[in-house]
Amino acid sequence: MAALRPARTSVAEKKTFKLHALSAVVMGLCASGQAYAQTESTNSNKKEEMPVVVVIGEKTERTIYDTSSSVQVFDQETIDNTPGATEIDDLLQLIPNMVDSGQGNSMPTVRGIDGSGPSIGGLASFAGTSPRLNMSIDGRSLTYSEIAFGPRSLWDMQQVEVYLGPQSYIQGRNASAGAIVMKTNDPTHHFESAVKAGVGERNYSQTAAMISAPIIQDELAFRLSFDQQKRDSFVDLASYEPAGDAKKIEMNSVRGKLLYEPSALAGFKTTLGVSHMDSRGPQSESTNVVGNEAFRPVYETKSLSTAWDISWQLNEVLTFENNLVYSKFAFDRYTNPLQKGDYTAEGKEFHVEPLLRYLSLGGRVNALVGARYYKSSQDDEYVDATSANPMSGSTKTQSAFAELTYALTQSIDVTVAGRYEKERVKRKVSDPRFKLDHDDTLSVFLPKFDIAFKPDMAQTFGFKVAKGYNSGGAGLAFNPILGGGFSPYQFEEEYIWNYEFYTRHRLGNSVELMTNTFYNDFDSMQMTQTLSNGDVLIANLDNAKTYGAEIGTRWYATDSLELFANLGLLKTEYKEVNGTSKELERAPNMTGNLGGQYSFFDGFELSANAAYTGDYFSDRSNTEIVKIDAYWVANAQLAYVFENGRAALFATNLFDSDKTTLYARGSLNEPLKQQPRMIGASLQLNF
């Protein structure tokens, strides 16, 4: 299966664009696509038929032509063909309307919305805020610290799906901006194994292995995988105790799975998996290292999770499934004792999600109904030179959801979905001086409506509307004028209404064209604000909106050449508490990428891509002096595929661009820059 990436066309960037003009362009593309599809191909050199992309991240397996979400899919083959791709961040630069600034507190923005949530750093620690971007591995949603600082290895990965736009109605909490769904490979009933070694500049290394084998033929099988990646930061950081060498970056991932498919129980399958992940590295790779900045805080994360999945086809039309996950996690932030600001956290999570699928014999009705129970607790502590500040938090979520797709006619499908969710959030700072003891319960209904017109198997035109949300909370305001303050406050939940027009086109057997045009209307958007008295806190805004489009194409030009292109267009606007209109931070008007893969001789593969990010503001106040200029990054890889393996030579940031991607905390003294060029090689052997 090849990857789908919302296509980009080569278009000159404009500072602004009107939604009606954008829609006209998209409609024009759609019309031309339909006309093309109705024309018989006359090119005798066309390659084999393009495979159809299948997505699984919305709890239902469906083709891309039946999927309304703006999604990009990377399967194992596509990951292998992406230059230097060994962890999830290597793929995110190929997502339109997504900006990943590099290692630091900030998660990627999605369509201009900060995936980290309304705040980062100490303000977020006290408030216990929730991310807006959900990242899950085998059904377990990662915590903020694991996403921002932790390991997200791509080794032995079956598929990665990146969804742009609210996924709350299907994913639940922490998905109002989007979702990244990662599915690892299951055990196989035949023997297979692989080892991989990689080396590169800045002491980069990767050591990975995998083995899968049957225990009882065609019934019981196991799979084990391991991946370790190391490198040195490109920033010249100091060593100090207790952190050690702040330049050292390391991630480890270990997984084990058992698959049981008893022959005596037809249609029944269960998988039990255990996963350990840990990482360490500087909290940020911003380049200011003068004075004490060289003693960069070091963040360590670790987690251990157990997942139990059941799938049982009860009869021809009904299938029961259940996902149960239990996790324990811990995070540690080490700092220079002369400027001590250590942070530690320990917590645990449990969730269970049963669901029932129905597919009518004629295929006219496709439905699912399910429920989810989630419970988490966390104890954390902030320790400075003079005091320790213990904190605690817990979340309990109960939800029920359903989705029904009904074929009104042979060419019109209607989908209705809804999720009712009740969430109780507690947050307490134990120090009586701060008087923070928050306990709030929220109930919310999240509907979705989708109508799709399919004139033939290779064409889809659709419109959908869906609601998303992010839960509220409480925290301690910081006042830099007073050098502290720490007054308690509360903020409300935020809501988003998402409207999208989408098209899917298969042009002959060699070209795909995908478009999603969106408008997002936010109610009570959460954002860090500075009040007139100097308090810095999370506040709810009256008005915010984003609109734009993702356009993607994939072309099998010949048997040996595959090309792709992606374009993201975006406009954002919000009003501060004082009524001033601003753009959202890290929200460029244009993003784009293009690339391809060429096979030649016998087993050689050349792949390359280039990604463009337009200019954007680094801070919420739209300060011109910390505005980020547009930048490019290019990557290339030459691989040789042989019977029992693959050898590759790769270069990331091929032209060694060193543009600034973010000014941390809006300060010119802390620029975060593109990682320098890395040249490396890898060898994988399959047995």
From Swiss-Prot:
Sorted UniProt keywords: Cell outer membrane, Ion transport, Iron, Iron transport, Membrane, Receptor, Signal, TonB box, Transmembrane, Transmembrane beta strand, Transport, Virulence
SUPFAM superfamilies attached to this UniProt entry: Porins
UniProt superkingdom: Bacteria
Molecular functions per Gene Ontology: high-affinity ferric iron transmembrane transporter activity; siderophore uptake transmembrane transporter activity; siderophore-iron transmembrane transporter activity; signaling receptor activity
Membrane topology recorded in Swiss-Prot or TrEMBL: Multi-pass membrane protein
Entries under Pfam families matching the protein: Plug
Single GO cellular component term: cell outer membrane
Compartment(s) of residence: Cell outer membrane
GO biological process, one term: siderophore-dependent iron import into cell
Short motif TonB C-terminal box, span: 670-687
Domain TBDR plug: 63-185
Induction field: Expression is up-regulated by low iron concentration condition. Iron-regulated expression is repressed by Fur.
Consequence of gene loss (knockout): Unable to use transferrin or ferric vulnibactin as iron source, but able to use heme, hemoglobin and FeSO4 as iron source. Reduced virulence (increased LD(50)) in infant mouse model.
Residue ranges constituting the TBDR beta-barrel domain according to the UniProt record: 190-687
Endpoints of the signal sequence: 1-37
Family designation: Belongs to the TonB-dependent receptor family.
NCBIfam families: TonB-siderophor
PANTHER family: FERRICHROME IRON RECEPTOR-RELATED, TONB-DEPENDENT OUTER MEMBRANE RECEPTOR
Task of the protein: Involved in the uptake of iron in complex with vulnibactin, a catecholate siderophore synthesized by V.vulnificus. Binds and transports ferric vulnibactin across the outer membrane. The energy source is provided by the inner membrane TonB system.
Protein name in the entry: Ferric vulnibactin receptor VuuA
Organism: Vibrio vulnificus
Name of the gene encoding the protein in the UniProt record: vuuA
